[in-house]
Amino acid sequence: KALETRYFETFLPIVTRKSRLEDIGLSVNGLPSWSGTNGVMVLFYPPPPKIKDDPTAKPDRLGRVIKKLAEHQKLDLRGKINIANSVLETLLDATDKVAVAFSGGRDSLVALHLTLQIRPNVVVLLVNTSIEFPETLAYVRQLAREWNLNFHEVKPKVNFWKLTEEQGIPVAGRGNTTFMRQLSDKAGVKLSNSCCRRMKETPARQFYRNYGIEGVVTGLRVCESLMRKMNFADYGALRYSKTYNTLVCWPLYAWTDEDITAYIELHKLPVNPLYSMGYNRVGCWACLQDMLYKDSRLFTLQQQHPHLYEAVRKKFGRQMIRLLSSWAELDKWAFDEEHLEGLYKPCSFEMLDEYRRLKRKRRKEQA
C-alpha cells in the first residue's frame, strides 16, 4: 500500500536498507526490487500485467498516471526543479555509483547541470557512435574542459554503414515494429533499428559494467512521444533497466520544451551550436528515423551539412525513395512531387526519376 501511494504521488520507488527490512520482519517476496553493493534495497511498485492477462489493468494505471502527470506538468519551473531534485536524490540514496548519459542535446544538458549541483564529480558519459555531428563532439569536449567534468567518451566496435548493410536501415522507432514490417515488405527494403542497440546501448552497458556504475541519469521526457508516456506509466521516474543492468532515472519527466528553454536561459548554459543552425535534434546525423515526415532533419542536413547529406544519399538514396513511395501507398495519399524535388533534386536527378518510374509502374499494374 505504501508503494502504491508513493508511486502514484511521486512516481518513485521506496529506498530502504536490507537490514531494516530484516529488523521489522518484512518480506518483499513477489515485489520487484533491486539491491546495490551498499546494502540498500529499492522496492518498486509492480508494473501492470500484460494486456492479454488483464485487459483493464494497464489502461486503468495509465489513466491514474496521466492525471497525476498533468498536475506535475502544470507546476512552474521551480516546482519542476524540485521534482527533478527529488528523483535525483532518490537515485543517490540508492547508490553513489552514478553516471549521467550526456548526448550533447538540450535535455541531457539540463539533466547534467541539475545533477552537478548535487554531485559535482559525477561520471559523465558520451557514446560517440562515429556518426555524431562534428559540432556535437567539439561542443561536448569543450564543455567537459570548461566545467572540469569527470568525462568519459566511448565508441562502439561496429561500423554503422556495415551494420545497416547487414541488418537494415533505421526509419522508425521501436514502438513501430508492425509499421516497419509492412513498409519493409512493401518497399522490398530491409529495415532495422538495431543500430541504436549495437552502437549506443552496448558500449554504454560495457562502460557501466567496467566502472561499476549502478545508476544512470537521463534527460528523457514523457511529452516527447506516446510510447514514452506509456513506458513511464509502467515504470515511473526511477526504474531498473535490463538493458544496462543499472537503475535509470528520468528527472525531467514532467518538463516541457518551454521549461528546458527557461532553465537554460536562467542559468546561461551554453548549448550545442546545431540548434542555432536549425536542427531540432542533435543525434546521429545518418539516422533516418524521421525521414518519413515533412519536417525531416534531412532538409536541414542538406542545407547545413551538404557533404554529410551526400553521404546519406549515396548510401541510402534508392532505398529512401522506395520507402517514401511505399509509405504513401500504404497510407493512401499521393506523395507531393514538389516535396521530393526539394529534398532530392539538388543532389541527384536520378532519385526523382526513380520515384517517377515506380509511380508509372504502379499505374500500369493498377490498370
Annotate each predicted stretch with a short phrase.
Residues 1-266, 362-367:
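ATP-dependent adenylation/nucleotidyltransferase module used to activate substrates
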Residues 133-135, 226, 296, 328-331:
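Short, charged/polar "capping" segments at the starts of alpha-helices
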Residues 147, 173, 295-298, 333-334:
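A general structural signal for short secondary-structure boundary/capping elements
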Residues 195-196, 284-287, 347:
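Disulfide-bonded cysteines in secreted/extracellular proteins and peptides
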Residues 199, 288-291, 351:
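Extracellular/secretory pathway and lumenal proteins
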Residues 253-308:
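Mid-to-C-terminal catalytic subdomains of enzymes
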Residues 303-319:
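Short microdomains enriched in Cys/His and/or Lys/Arg
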Residues 322-367:
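Short flanking/linker segments adjacent to small metal-binding domains or redox-active Cys/His motifs
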